[in-house]
Curated annotation (Swiss-Prot):
This is Probable cytosolic iron-sulfur protein assembly protein 1. SUPFAM superfamilies: WD40 repeat-like. Residues 107-116 have a biased composition (Acidic residues). Pfam families: WD40. SMART domains: WD40. Keywords: Repeat, WD repeat.
Length: 440
């Protein structure tokens, strides 16, 4: 039996917190806010056995490491780490994208010797002689500001190999930038296919395929066509009716408390204005499965949709397979973790297990879903129907940020596999919270 255990609240932002993101290689958690700052929290993970922890196991210890006072003029809406963990991108409502790196301030002597240096900084990790940094204090500095969007930047993200950076905006555009040496970025594509505000982007975990979600109710899938340039190869539009979320009476009490509404909650939910299926709904968020065969989306009606890739070619089509009722209001954030060793057989994973999907949104709930499918077919093009895929809630927390919306959830997914089952959330109350999935 699993549950969601709170590890506490971290020093909060002064205004709503919008995005949280774990560094993939270092013990750092980043958050951003309307207050225009980026906060970096360091943490120590106690040694533990493989698999998910129990509720009595030692907890990770977090501390505020740095408050970055950005030069952004408005809300910092989105942040994303590069795969090597050395670079952090920030997208702001001032229409710009900031690129941040940890650097060492040059001494006065070094400034005179290196007048050609960019600003008064050099990358952390090397000194002027090419040796180690010698314990010198490091600072996070904006090494590049990318301009081009005409309105609020809503989301940023690096491709899986770190070679590309993408951004999207209220101006209906999606930009792709090529990462070059010395903090240089070249715009290689501007896609203007959406008819409304583009809310989020998500890179495929292994390939250069970019998904974007919009207020226009569409999900666009783009890739670099070898015969031309970056282009949209499919436009996905939700169509399946939702399957009601059923919580058996035999479910753990904490799951029933979180997901089965009381009479008062039912009355309040009935008064909410949720768009019916026949009306277009905003697609707020996207998340790829770790194997790249599935794409999850969340929207205004509170449901979660799963889309299956029907082939192995870069431009293979995706098909909507499932739409399950999940939240009572808009789903603002999704995050998909790799499969974890099961409690029953630590150290092994079920080949049909797609991992855990975390969802959060306007109703203040965090829900953890387990998703399983039949074993991988011999043919990558073999499709799965909605009766074969299983999505079920295994842990949940209501009022995770009090009465406030939850704007972001993110799993701790590291190369060294430390921090399994740990995730963070950011809310309108400005707080950043940390949770973990534990075994009772």
């Amino acid at each position: 039996m699993l549950r969601l255990q709170s590890l506490g609240s971290l020093p909060a932002h002064a205004e709503p917190a919008w995005t949280v993101s774990f560094n993939p290689t270092r013990s750092l958690l980043a958050s951003c806010s309307t207050d225009r700052t980026i906060r970096l929290y360091s943490y120590i993970i106690p040694s533990s056995s493989d698999g998910l922890p129990s509720q009595d196991d030692s907890q990770a210890v977090f501390s505020l490491a740095k408050v970055i006072e950005t030069d952004h003029k408005r809300t910092v809406r989105s942040i994303a780490w590069s795969p090597d963990g050395r670079t952090l991108a920030s997208g702001s409502f001032d229409s710009t994208v900031g690129v941040w790196e940890e650097v060492i301030p040059l001494s006065d002597d070094e400034e005179e010797e290196d007048e050609g240096a960019q600003g008064v900084y050099k990358p952390a990790g090397v000194d002027s002689d090419g040796d180690g940094d010698g314990g010198k204090e490091k600072e996070w500095e904006c090494v590049t500001t990318l301009e081009g969007h005409e309105s609020e930047c809503k989301s940023v993200g690096f491709s899986s190999d770190g070679a590309l950076l993408a951004s999207c905006s209220r101006d209906k555009s999606v930009w792709v930038w090529e990462v070059q040496p010395d903090a240089d970025f070249e715009c290689i594509a501007v896609m203007m296919e959406h008819s409304q505000d583009v809310k989020s982007i998500a890179w495929h975990p292994h390939e250069e395929i970019l998904a974007s979600a919009s207020y226009d109710s569409y999900i666009h899938l783009a890739y670099d066509d070898p015969d031309s340039d970056w282009c949209i190869f499919q436009k996905l539009h939700p169509s399946l009716p939702s399957t009601p979320l059923t919580i058996p009476s035999t479910s753990p009490s904490h799951l029933i408390d979180a997901l089965v509404p009381t009479e008062e909650e039912k009355k309040a939910e009935a008064e909410l204005q949720v768009p019916p299926l026949e009306e277009d709904e905003t697609v707020w968020c996207l998340a790829w499965s770790p194997d790249g065969r599935w794409l999850a989306s969340g929207g205004d009606n509170g449901g979660i949709r799963l889309w299956q890739r029907t082939g192995s070619q870069p431009d293979s089509a995706f098909k909507e397979i499932l739409h399950t009722a999940a939240h009572s209001r808009s789903v603002f954030s999704l995050s998909w973790s790799p499969p974890y060793p099961s409690a029953e057989s630590a150290g092994s994973t079920d080949s049909t297990d797609l991992g855990m999907l975390a969802s959060a949104g306007e109703d203040g709930k965090i829900i953890i879903w387990q998703i399983t499918v039949p074993p991988s077919p011999s043919s990558a093009s073999q499709e799965i129907d909605n009766e074969q895929i299983s999505i079920r809630p295994i842990a949940a927390q209501k009022d995770a940020h009090g009465v406030n919306d939850i704007n972001s959830v993110a799993w701790c997914v590291r190369e060294d596999k430390k921090g399994w089952g740990m995730l963070s959330s950011a809310g309108d109350d400005g707080s950043v919270k940390v949770w973990r999935v534990v075994r009772d």
